[in-house]
Amino acid sequence: MRYLWLFLIGTIGLFATDKTLDIIKTIQKLPKIEVRYSTDNDANYALKLHEVLANDLKTSQHFDVSQNKDQGAINYTELKDKKVHLVALVSVAVENGNKISRLKLYDVNTSTLVKTFDYPILSADLYPFAAHNMAIVVNDYLKAPSIAWMKRLIVFSKYIGPGITNIALADYTMRYQKEIIKNNRLNIFPKWANAEQTEFYYTQYGERTPMILKYNIQKATHENIASSQGMAVVSSVSSDGSKILMSLAPDGQPDVYLYDTHKKTKTKITRYPGIDVSGVFLEDDKSMAFVSDRSGYPNIYMKKLGLKESAEQLLYEGRSNESIDAYKDSIVYVSRENLNEFGKTVFNLNLITLNSKYIRRLTVNGSNQMPRFSTDGRNIMYIKKTPQEYAMGLILLDYNQSFLFPLKNVKIQAFDW
């Protein structure tokens, strides 16, 4: 059992991401936006906002972005000649002695100021979130597909030393990072407990047995959920937060359990004399996908949420399919592949849906691990490692585009988005 636990930690620690994906470009004219910043009050802070905002708008795939300093009064005639549609001006304002991040959005076509958005500067290191919220305001003005996912927090476990990991929060670019659980213990596998991101589950390896705890960020309080010999991990939370799927091993071999957060009861829903782990909700929380060695090697199965329900094998390609996440009827998983031309084992991300046998390859090289869907299912974050880099990866499924955000001086054990 100890071997299984170490194996699970180890495989999730095989960090990987692809430098780039094949980019499929369609011929389209994106609205041009010029992002400017003011040097008044706090030029350095405004410049940071400016850089993150410009990058967010580029990442969205909805804008043709250029950057500039504040040019004073808006010269609409000149901007129209340059075929610029919008100007976003970021600045730092001071009101009643308090600093505020401010966005002014100008519509060049109508020659008007159309939006003013203020974001309080509660702490200087929170500037990425101010910029992410500004990007959402600009995007919503054009009624483009939502990019609200940009303002979500990432919760992750980071290695500190032998037997020690801390839990931290970050923005999606990893510019902002803050440790919130530091106790010289093994704190691993964090998983958001609700859509509001005010609570999360995680496993703490105590004196003898691993324990699943729920932590309230605002109150800094803990609640004991479950414990089990050898293994105790929350792998999925239902859309309303009322149920969770856990991998527990009270009798030696791990199985998937369904936990009711209101009744505080757990029900065993797999019974196999082998390994059943990593259950994730499917089909509006009516069924689950999970990883099992029923095929003699790790593979993906699905079943309804009942002990007597039969399990159905989902994949018949590959000899090691694991590390999964799901959104409605879509499943993203890690597939271990043959050695590449450099003699390295490749771990790639693949995407499948329940109503199609088509397997969509999402990465092409390196070690790509821990895929996590965004809350709208349109994007995937993951960890990527190659000999040249270690980064947080982002895949925009609608645009066949990917981005990498370098991870410097941090090694991630697990994360949730």
UniProtKB/Swiss-Prot annotation:
InterPro entries: 6-blade_b-propeller_TolB-like, PD40, Tol-Pal_TolB. Pfam families: PD40 (PF07676). One of its GO terms (cellular component) is periplasmic space. Keywords: Cell cycle, Cell division, Periplasm, Signal. It is found in: Periplasm. Residues 1-16 form the signal peptide. One of its GO terms (biological process) is protein import. Gene3D superfamilies: TolB, C-terminal domain, TolB, N-terminal domain. Part of the Tol-Pal system, which plays a role in outer membrane invagination during cell division and is important for maintaining outer membrane integrity. Belongs to the TolB family. HAMAP family: TolB. The Tol-Pal system is composed of five core proteins: the inner membrane proteins TolA, TolQ and TolR, the periplasmic protein TolB and the outer membrane protein Pal. They form a network linking the inner and outer membranes and the peptidoglycan layer. This is Tol-Pal system protein TolB. It comes from Helicobacter pylori (strain HPAG1). The gene is tolB.
